[in-house]
C-alpha cells in the first residue's frame, strides 16, 4: 500500500461521511500509512461535516484534489457491518469487526435535557415505509411521551404529542442534544450514526424497505415501527399464487386456441 491514503465520499450526508470516519486511524495504526488525505472531490450537504468529522480528526493530515476509489454495494456479508465492508474494500483490515463510526469531539452537556426523552423526526436518506402515524402508534403502545422534539424539516415523521421544539444551530449543538438526553429516539438515518460515533445508544426507528446494512451499530436498538403482519404476509403470498395461476390459465387457453 502507498504511504498516502486518500478518502473520497461521494454521498454528502452526515451518515455517509461517518461511515468512513474510522478509516484514517486504521490506515495509520494497521495499514502502514504515513499520510491520510481527504479528496476535495468529496460531497458535503453541510460544511459542518468537513469541519467536525475530517478537520477535527487527528489522523487526517489534510485535503487533496486527487481522486480515490469509492465502493458501491447494497448489502454486506454476514459477520460484518457497513463500516467493515468499506474498510476491506479500501484494502485495510485491522482484524476487528462491527466497527463504530468515530467523532473526535466531546459535546457540552445541556442541563435542561438531563432526564429527558428527545425525539428527532427528521431524515434525508431513505428510512423505509414509515410515516408519522406509525410513530404515534408505536409510542402509544410503548407509553413513550417525548419531552422534547427537534424542529421538523423537509422530510420527517413528526408526532403531535411532544414538549418544546428544539432547533439545532450546528452539528456541535446536535451532538450536545444527543449526549444530554436521558433517552434519544430518532429515525435510522444520520442521527443514529452520529449517536454511534458519540458512543451513545439510541432507539433508531425504521420501516419496511430500508436496507438492513444501515442497522450497523451494536449500540442501538433498531425498531421496525411498521412491521408486516402475518395476515399481510399470507395475503401477499395468496396474491402471488393467484397471479401465477392466472398466467398459467392464460397460457393453457392460448395453447388450445393455437391448435
What is the role of each PLM region?
Residues 1-259:
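Catalytic machinery of carbohydrate-active enzymes
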Amino acid at each position: 500500500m502507498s504511504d498516502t491514503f486518500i478518502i473520497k465520499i461521494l454521498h454528502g450526508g452526515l451518515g455517509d461521511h461517518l461511515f468512513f470516519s474510522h478509516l484514517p486511524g486504521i490506515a495509520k495504526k494497521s495499514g502502514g500509512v504515513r499520510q491520510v488525505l481527504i479528496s476535495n472531490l468529496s460531497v458535503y450537504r453541510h460544511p459542518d461535516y468537513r469541519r467536525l468529522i475530517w478537520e477535527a480528526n487527528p489522523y487526517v493530515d489534510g485535503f487533496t484534489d486527487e481522486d480515490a476509489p469509492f465502493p458501491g454495494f447494497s448489502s454486506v456479508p454476514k459477520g460484518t457491518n457497513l463500516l467493515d465492508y468499506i474498510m476491506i474494500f479500501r484494502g485495510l483490515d485491522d482484524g476487528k469487526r462491527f466497527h463504530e463510526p468515530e467523532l473526535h469531539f466531546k459535546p457540552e452537556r445541556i442541563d435542561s435535557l438531563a432526564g429527558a426523552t428527545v425525539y428527532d423526526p427528521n431524515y434525508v436518506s431513505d428510512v423505509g415505509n414509515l410515516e408519522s402515524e406509525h410513530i404515534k402508534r408505536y409510542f402509544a403502545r410503548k407509553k413513550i411521551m417525548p419531552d422534547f422534539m427537534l424542529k421538523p424539516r423537509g422530510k420527517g415523521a413528526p408526532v403531535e404529542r411532544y414538549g418544546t421544539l428544539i432547533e439545532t444551530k450546528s452539528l456541535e449543538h446536535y451532538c450536545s442534544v444527543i449526549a444530554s438526553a436521558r433517552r434519544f429516539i430518532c429515525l435510522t438515518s444520520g442521527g443514529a450514526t452520529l449517536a454511534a460515533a458519540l458512543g451513545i445508544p439510541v432507539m433508531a426507528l425504521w420501516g419496511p424497505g430500508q436496507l438492513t446494512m444501515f442497522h450497523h451499530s451494536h449500540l442501538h436498538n433498531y425498531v421496525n415501527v411498521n412491521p408486516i403482519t402475518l395476515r399481510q404476509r399470507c395475503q401477499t403470498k395468496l396474491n402471488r399464487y393467484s397471479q401465477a395461476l392466472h398466467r398459467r390459465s392464460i397460457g393453457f387457453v392460448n395453447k388450445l386456441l393455437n391448435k
